[in-house]
Design a protein with these regions (language model features):
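Non-catalytic architectural context of zinc metalloproteases
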Residues: 30, 42, 60, 65-74, ...
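Early extracytoplasmic/domain-onset interaction patches
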Residues: 14-58
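Bacterial N-terminal signal peptides
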Residues: 1-3
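Intrinsically disordered/low-complexity terminal segments and short unstructured peptides
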Residues: 12-14, 106
Length: 233
């Protein structure tokens, strides 16, 4: 189940990472039966020093340290011309990329088999992503907007449920900065969705819309009953 609140102001327009204005994330699922996701992160306009890529060790609403990087494997890096670089793992959750030309394309796979809101879970029916457990980020790039492109497995009619800002492409979304990105989980599946308004007790004229996306084997009627109970929570 994904509960999606109203988006905050600050939607961004997807642009190219080459000018250094944004960071591009491309997420694909070539073999969901093996429970891993392919991630490509591209950033341009970088200073000459090495770029440090980090995996989070904390997650919103969680009060313990999590070594999310333990699920990362097959790490590679390239410059803007496609030349392969040598990412050095300097700590458990950090890779340093030197020798780039101002642009870095950083790629890796991340394993996930836990749909618990803390990690990520991938199988042939869906992918449920807690972003701190899924996406690495560049140190010093935290204020840059991000564009996230999802590529479902071939032959799957997956949609995307997320509080990331939508674009004209139903599989491309944006975030105004890293903090918003990390706080925006995503569910990819052939889910069902319902929405409802919730009035602000301090301002009854303000009633933002909340959405419920449910990946399940039930009926529309069962989802309707479930959705009617959510506002009571």
């Amino acid at each position: 189940v994904s509960f999606l609140g109203p988006r905050l102001p600050g939607a961004q327009t997807a642009t190219s990472p080459a000018d250094g204005a944004m960071v591009l994330y491309e997420l694909s699922f070539p073999a969901p039966e093996h429970r891993w996701m392919q991630v490509e992160v591209t950033a341009g306009g970088l200073p000459a020093e090495p770029l440090s890529m980090r995996m989070s060790t904390a997650s919103p609403g969680r009060y313990a340290r999590h070594e999310f990087a333990k699920n990362v494997f097959e790490v590679r890096a390239f410059d803007g011309n496609g030349n392969e670089l040598d990412p050095v793992r300097s700590t458990m959750a950090r890779w340093d990329v030197a020798g780039h030309d101002g642009t870095v394309r950083f790629t890796y796979k991340v394993f996930g088999d836990r749909v618990d809101g803390t990690y990520l879970g991938i199988d042939v029916t869906h992918a449920h992503l807690n972003i701190p457990a899924s996406l690495m980020w560049g140190v010093g790039l935290e204020r840059r907007p991000a564009t996230v492109r999802f590529e479902p497995p071939a032959g799957r009619d997956w949609q995307v449920a997320t509080q990331l800002y939508p674009s004209d492409d139903p599989l491309t979304f944006t975030a105004p900065n890293l903090q918003y990105l990390l706080d925006s989980p995503a569910e990819l599946s052939a889910f069902m969705e319902r929405s409802f308004p919730v009035a602000d007790p301090a301002n009854p004229d303000h009633a933002p819309t909340f959405r419920v996306a449910l990946h399940h084997d039930g009926t529309d009627a069962e989802l309707d009953r479930f959705a009617r109970r959510v506002p009571q929570a």
